[in-house]
Amino acid sequence: VLDGNAILFITERYGMRAHASWGSLNDVMLVFMNQDAYDKFRLSKEDYELQKELEKEQKNTTEAKKNDKKKGDNKEKSEEKKEEKVKDIVVELNNIEDRIVRLTPNSSDLGSAIITKDGETLYYLSAFEGGYDLWKMNLRKKDTKLLHKMDAGWANMEMDKDGKNLFLLGSNTMQKMGTDSESLKPISYQAHVKMDLAAERDYMFNHVYKQEQKRFYNLNMHGIDWDAMTKAYRKFLPHIDNNYDFAELLSEYLGELNVSHTGGRFRPQLKGDATATLGLLYDWNHNGKGLLISEVVEKGPFDHARSKVKAGNIIEKIDGQEITPESDYSVLLNGKARKKTLVTLYNPQTKERWEEVVVPVSNGVMSDLLYARWVKQRAADVDKWSNGRLGYVHIESMGDDSFRSVYSDILGKYNNREGIVIDTRFNGGGRLHEDIEILFSGKKYFTQVVRGREACDMPSRRWNKPSIMVQCEANYSNAHGTPWVYSHQKIGKLVGMPVPGTMTSVSWETLQDPTLVFGIPVIGYRLPDGSYLENSQLEPDIKVANSPETVVKGEDTQLKAAVDELLKEIDGKSVSYTHLRAHETDQYL
């Protein structure tokens, strides 16, 4: 930007960072290549205007001298075309770090940023409330204003070469804005394309081949002759005429690499029927009419003060339609998510019948409610088995939301517990191994005391007491790496079942046909001995399986084993410490 005298970039230097390893608020910055450009940028509005007048006068004087000289030249010389000399960019690396300027007045979730050719105006896309909006900042006056409320889920923009128009691409629209009028106008278009789908699939197959060849984390492709393997699978292409089969072909093809985080996926853009749920659990041994309620799920549609629904009640009708043993009640909830629905109920104990209007939820919402129920049950079991001595946290995924929940619980309601059971089972990954390592590897070095009263132990933002981690066969990706780091750093023991070696980082790429996606494992995690965590199974210190027979009874054998082991460790350390203190006392008697 600024004719090559500065570089515009976005950084998280001043922004708030997420608890977890990624995610932050950003700022737009400029770094100036030379002192002259930096000095001009910092001029006040008045000084800048004076500077422009001075430069204008100097330019006029120079041109006048040139014109006087031309009068004496002959006609032939006056008609010669003079090549315009490209102005050199002066780059002064000395003290360049002192010529970095923060442009945005505050950090935010940024989408894109552009500075005008004269360096006077900054346009940027930022999300403060909801989606991305277009903001404008006068860099000389330091004046910022919201230019257009767009509320876009994602957005990007480019300026034309003359600097007269901004082109904005949002979630579902393309728009144009003249920098003089600053009014947004939609860009409408209509196009027809005739696709050779077989040729497109051939192109996409070649693209997958090249991308894996150039970006796969392991240089020898896990020992696979990639060209030969590609040739072997290419012969199936002429026989494929749909994306279902093409995605399956990609999965088989990429599966030859014997690696996680890859394969082809087809995401058909179809809107099918969606069955809602009432947020209830039922007794399937009930043979009569209606649905016998066995549990009202917490925070579900019926879990509110005005509802009389409880376990033991029977749902007789939904929107006036009777439920019989022969009928499928789910049909009555088709398309009812977030819509008011009339439910007729019966209490066998009091013989009372009544109706309630409820708003059913989607299966996705119900899944979240059942997850919260599962975690609450595990926490209650740990509390019961340890007699209130241990706390329990479950890391749902290796991301910021889960980390915040864990952080809040261990340093909040469980702060005074003697130990923590960390459950990673069924975690699909993300990136938290460093954060979990730091959080649970605290070692107390002193205590803050205020007028004789202990305030807190230090470090105060880490767990300084014993812990244990539970894992299972369903752990994946960073949920393999996190227990590995936890064990390798000797923070605590692992309890449960072996975890498949799936610790790589992936780049999921959408193909030219946006219904198709494939994965490239681009980062491997290598150990000092040269081996990788990928394909290296992680064994627990204490191997315990949850059998189907115990799971259906609501019993968690793995969790019970973890509680017993952690209590044994804590009690063992307590006995050892008491013995050590007694021995030290004997020395001074």
What are these regions (language model features)?
Residues 1-80, 126-133, 171-175, 194-197:
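A flexible loop/linker signature enriched in serine peptidases of the S9 family
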Residues 215, 316, 321-322, 326-513, ...:
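Cleft-lining beta-strand/loop regions that shape enzyme active-site pockets
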